[in-house]
């Protein structure tokens, strides 16, 4: 598949590893091994052509929407990147695994990832430049306990981390909005463990995020974020 082993995907690996051919090649081989482990070519056949939205009908979509809602494609940035939105206060990590189990969550995630990578590939070809993802993570009213699910952590380590590593260089920017003070302190410690390329892309913003987001997206896209259920326009 061109979006899996074509020039654009190879370029993502090169850029993601600062143009180090040995590191990029090792990561690319790891990606192929991960794809083989999860039979992702079969997933690609079924889901790569499906638009990557919260209404796409991926496996177990209803359960995911109940327990881990958001906008997988809220719109597009002024420069053509995909904008996604995740309101973490609404994410119930233990509940979703109790609801559908690890295998079903993995089935959903694989389908969504193949759809996402195909989406970015198509946009890159249309725009003549590498399309990426702008992720808006909303910490409004978040409680620390919501982020500490041991069961989810085990599932994530066993499955999603390797899958995420296979999607090298897809992030253009991460905006963490409505960031409380405790999260700022936590991030100051965490960022030293992050790859420098990743840390450069993360921007923490308080409740006055509107002006900054309008530098990268239009009013319509921002409106979908601010108008998300429970946001009350702020």
Where is each model-derived feature located?
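Basic, amphipathic alpha-helical/coil surface patches used to engage anionic, phosphate-bearing ligands
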Residues: 1-234
């Amino acid at each position: 598949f061109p979006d899996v082993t074509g020039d654009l995907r190879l370029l993502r690996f090169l850029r993601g590893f600062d143009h180090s051919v040995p590191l990029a090649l090792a990561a690319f081989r790891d990606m192929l091994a991960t794809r083989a482990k999860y039979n992702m070519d079969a997933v690609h056949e079924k889901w790569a052509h499906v638009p990557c939205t919260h209404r796409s009908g991926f496996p177990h979509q209803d359960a995911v929407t109940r327990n881990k809602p958001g906008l997988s494609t809220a719109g597009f940035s002024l420069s053509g990147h995909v904008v996604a939105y995740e309101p973490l206060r609404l994410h119930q990590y233990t509940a979703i695994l109790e609801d559908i189990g690890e295998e079903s969550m993995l089935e959903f995630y694989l389908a969504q990832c193949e759809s996402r990578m195909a989406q970015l590939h198509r946009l890159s070809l249309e725009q003549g430049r590498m399309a990426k993802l702008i992720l808006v993570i909303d910490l409004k009213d978040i409680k620390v306990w919501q982020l500490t699910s041991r069961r989810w952590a085990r599932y994530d380590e066993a499955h999603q981390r390797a899958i995420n590593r296979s999607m090298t260089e897809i992030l253009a920017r991460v905006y963490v909005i409505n960031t409380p003070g405790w999260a700022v302190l936590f991030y100051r410690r965490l960022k030293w463990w992050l790859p420098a390329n990743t840390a450069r892309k993360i921007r923490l913003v308080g409740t006055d995020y509107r002006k900054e987001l309008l530098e990268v997206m239009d009013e319509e896209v921002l409106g979908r974020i601010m108008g998300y259920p429970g946001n009350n326009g702020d």
